[in-house]
């Protein structure tokens, strides 16, 4: 069996290399929400010229989408380390999500439906990064203990090959990343949602709260 890759270590080695070479590459960072972005931005802004991409057609309902988008904008405007960070928000088209997960609606959270959602959002990031000549792209998603970092990186590497823009390896939950995101969320009084985003995860969460799952 092959050794499991340490994506957090791979990222640290890249950062050390860029620092030694006095390089600060451009990075398109797909962001799912403000809490997950907080610790990632704090870690990366000194080493990359970052543009944040908010593309999350999975989020339900639209009011929830708008709330998360507004919190991300507020975070970027308030963090001292994000003065140079740009934000791009792509149109909110929920049908893109439903098309991507068609036939997977009843698969439990954390399975193939989620992987299809990862790919949908990361592919939008890869396309944008390639079209705008970024040095790297990645996503904040791996900061969550509920997200499969190996799958995220495998998807990222496949998209890198497809679109010709390198994927930045990451497992942001490691090295106290998730713990730091909780602290920063408290520091900035960020809205922390209690479900991943889609209507299916919302229903699952509500069922668990009622003791039905």
Regions found by a protein language model. Name each.
Residues 44:
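Aromatic pocket-lining residues of Rossmann-like dinucleotide-binding sites
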Residues 1-39, 47-213:
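Nucleotide-activated chemistry modules centered on ATP-dependent adenylation/adenylyltransferase
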């Amino acid at each position: 069996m092959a050794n499991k890759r340490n994506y957090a270590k791979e990222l640290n080695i890249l950062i050390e290399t860029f620092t030694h070479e006095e390089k600060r590459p451009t990075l398109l960072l797909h962001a799912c929400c403000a809490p997950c972005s907080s610790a990632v931005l704090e870690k990366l802004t000194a080493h990359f010229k970052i543009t944040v991409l908010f593309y999350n057609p999975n989020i339900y309902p639209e009011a929830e989408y708008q709330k998360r988008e507004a919190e991300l904008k507020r975070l970027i405007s308030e963090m001292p380390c994000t003065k140079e960070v740009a934000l791009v928000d792509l149109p909110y088209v929920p049908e893109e999500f439903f098309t991507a997960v068609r036939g997977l609606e009843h698969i439990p959270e954390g399975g193939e439906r989620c992987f299809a959602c990862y790919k949908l959002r990361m592919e939008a990031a890869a396309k944008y990064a390639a079209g705008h000549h970024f040095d790297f792209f990645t996503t904040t998603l791996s900061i969550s203990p509920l997200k499969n970092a190996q799958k995220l990186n495998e998807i990222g590497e496949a998209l890198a090959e497809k679109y010709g823009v390198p994927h930045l390896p990451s497992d942001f939950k490691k090295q106290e990343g998730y713990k730091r995101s909780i602290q920063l969320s408290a520091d900035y009084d960020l809205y922390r949602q209690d479900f991943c985003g889609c209507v299916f995860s919302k229903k699952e969460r509500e069922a668990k709260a009622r003791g039905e799952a």
